[in-house]
Amino acid sequence: DTVPAGDRWIHEMKYDGYRILVGVGSGEARAYTRSGLDWSQRFPSVLSEARKLKVRSALIDGEAVVVDANGRSNFQALQNALKGAPATIDFYAFDLLELDGEDLTRRPLLERKEKLQAILPAKNAILRYSDHILGRGEELLERFCAAGLE
């Protein structure tokens, strides 16, 4: 595997979970798959926390995951949790597409991520900001591979 070189590239962790869009508005929150299916009933704890965000509305892109004892996302554990096995499902948010009625999709990614980080609680066990690193892609890939991450 190779990664782009240079200091202008953003590098993020790849999580092994379900990518979902969380929509918040009018005191409600919903979860949708990439294909538009409403999976809100599958992520009640994520949506309960999303309802508490101090926004009029937001559309947040991220990954629903179960983190194992080693701190790695575990897809099988997530599938088991969705079938009723006891586990905490976390949501790693990595992009903010809409905020308080404003479409942010034409804004630079770093600006969107800054706004996203500002609306997420600093210490929340379920809603988490997915951080990024600017540049040093080869070094980061090497470290991720050494740690058994994707």
Predicted regions and their residues:
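Catalytic cores of nucleic-acid ligases and guanylyltransferases
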Residues: 1-150
